[in-house]
Amino acid sequence: MIGLIGRKVGMTRVFNEDGVSIPVTVIEIEANRVTQVKTLENDGYSAIQVTTGTKKASRVTKPEAGHFVKAGVEAGRGLWEFRTEGEEFTLGQEINVDIFADVKKVDVTGTSKGKGFAGGVKRWNFRTQDATHGNSLSHRVLGSIGQNQTPGRVFKGKKMAGHLGAERVTVQSLEVVRVDAERKLLLVKGAVPGATNSNVIVKPAVKA
């Protein structure tokens, strides 16, 4: 089953039948319009390309505009692709949030909030060094980053200070709390990556 592109609206809470508060993220999923159907014969694999939302005509490049016109759909805020397995789709077809009506759990992919340059304590949850006992400068410093003449280098992948956030992150197996097809909303339990109004990709959970 394919996924859908949505917009992270924010977080709130809902109450179940027992009156228990459930923290949920609200994802607005407007109709996803099919802009291209890729086939095994023509493209080497089966997939559909979709768009959603709207974009000002002045913000659409000529190649993009031609692509949208060929598909017979309104220009959207981006293009995304989902692999297909036997499902039939047509150009211009609209796919709505109600495809998740019978789905129990979903995987949500987004771009995490950028935090800029961060030290090891914030970026990797390193513990801090002694506050006193002779330590006057190295309270939040990494400490040793390697050995001696052997191997004589710092290994690749060593956890160090650097850029934190602003990367693609997937949170798996989030419970679907509610599907509101009328208002085009999907409520999932817990937090999803990204800032408010950012694009997120919602797919049925692979581990469900």
Curated annotation (Swiss-Prot):
GO terms for biological process: translation. HAMAP family: Ribosomal_uL3_B. Keywords: Methylation, Ribonucleoprotein, Ribosomal protein, RNA-binding, rRNA-binding. GO terms for cellular component: cytosolic large ribosomal subunit. Belongs to the universal ribosomal protein uL3 family. This is Large ribosomal subunit protein uL3. Part of the 50S ribosomal subunit. Forms a cluster with proteins L14 and L19. GO terms for molecular function: rRNA binding; structural constituent of ribosome. One of the primary rRNA binding proteins, it binds directly near the 3'-end of the 23S rRNA, where it nucleates assembly of the 50S subunit. PANTHER family: 50S RIBOSOMAL PROTEIN L3, LARGE RIBOSOMAL SUBUNIT PROTEIN UL3C. Methylated by PrmB. Disulfide bonds: none annotated. It holds the Pfam family Ribosomal_L3. It comes from the Bacteria. The modification N5-methylglutamine is found at residue 149. The gene is rplC.
